[in-house]
Curated annotation (Swiss-Prot):
The active site is at D165. PANTHER family: 3-DEOXY-D-MANNO-OCTULOSONIC-ACID TRANSFERASE/TRNA GUANINE-N 7 - -METHYLTRANSFERASE, PENTACOTRIPEPTIDE-REPEAT REGION OF PRORP DOMAIN-CONTAINING PROTEIN. The keyword GTP-binding does not apply. It comes from Bifidobacterium longum (strain NCC 2705). It comes from the Bacteria. The gene is trmB. This is tRNA (guanine-N(7)-)-methyltransferase. Substrate binds at K169, D201, T262, N263, F264, E265. It catalyses: guanosine(46) in tRNA + S-adenosyl-L-methionine = N(7)-methylguanosine(46) in tRNA + S-adenosyl-L-homocysteine.
Length: 286
């Protein structure tokens, strides 16, 4: 596969200025993904070769997809990478890119950053964006928590996390992308009253989101829909047990109208799963 570092955009070099170095990363990090073979078929390889130089940001370092030392995602970075100071929306885990590319096409006045770790997903996003000739979208193949650690305050208008890896085993819940530490970094990155939109079709993950986010200082749940969820986690393969557990009411959101119906979401609906939407607004910390 073509080395992305040889073709990708390097906004840090383009700015020609010194930026605060990224903090040192621990040797052993909890990752929200597992690296798999990234072999591309001919069509996706051509997409990578043709469009990486236009859309792919050269900010990754190392096989764990850490953010390269010296990179800071701030307004100067945005202006260098996108060529304007329009609001920035970041989608974490864009998969095949269907949603983020559709959003970018529908909102040319907004900048979009697609975060995806898997080569085929990155390549397919490049393909969709390139076929439409979009100019307001960029792609970064990095670990999202690491990028938000080096994102300056007030840089991002919205963060989207739609259908993240559910990590169903209880021992793996620490790998779920929605965590208090991540919420803290996203809160800092967002503009005043910016929002974090989350969606999942896994009931156990919905409970996890409520446990992490509801009542967390600095966040306001903007939902208006009452849902009933079990009060305990059931673990992988035990979803049927949830119906007999004690339940409580929680507040969630209507389906986000800005999210297209992707193939992934269609499969969840076809399997009879309920979609849980969340909208959390960043407010002043107490």
């Amino acid at each position: 596969m073509t080395n992305p570092e040889s073709t990708a955009i390097d906004p840090v070099a383009a700015m020609g200025t010194d930026h605060t170095e990224a903090p040192a990363h621990p040797l052993h990090k909890v990752l929200s993904f597992v690296r798999r073979s990234g072999r591309l078929d001919d069509r996706l390889q051509r997409a990578w070769d043709n469009y990486a130089g236009t859309y792919l940001l050269d900010i990754a370092a190392g096989n764990l997809l850490d953010v390269r030392e010296g990179v800071t995602l701030d307004r100067a970075f945005v202006e260098s990478a996108w060529g304007n100071d329009n609001p920035l929306i970041v989608e974490i885990g864009t998969g095949q890119g269907e949603n983020v590319v559709a959003a970018a096409a529908a909102h040319p006045e907004t900048n979009f950053l697609a975060l995806e770790v898997y080569d085929p997903g990155v390549a397919h996003t490049l393909l969709l964006a390139g076929k439409q000739g979009l100019t307001n979208i960029r792609v970064a193949q990095v670990n999202a928590p690491e990028l938000f650690k080096v994102t300056a305050a007030g840089t991002v208008a919205e963060v989207w996390t739609f259908f993240p890896d559910p990590w169903p085993k209880k021992k793996h819940h620490k790998r779920r992308i929605v965590q208090k530490a991540m919420a803290g970094d996203i809160h800092r990155a967002l503009v005043t009253d910016g929002v974090w939109r989350i969606a999942t079709d896994i009931e156990d993950y919905a409970l996890h989101v409520h446990e992490v986010m509801d009542g967390l200082d600095g966040w306001k749940n903007l939902g208006s829909v009452t849902v009933s969820l079990p009060l305990e986690h059931v673990g992988k393969g035990n979803a049927d047990m949830a119906a007999d557990m004690p339940h409580a009411d929680f507040t969630e959101s209507e389906r986000f109208e800005g999210r297209v119906l992707t193939n992934f979401e269609k499969k969840g609906l076809a399997a009879g799963r309920v979609i849980h939407d969340f909208t959390y607004q960043a407010v002043t910390l107490n």
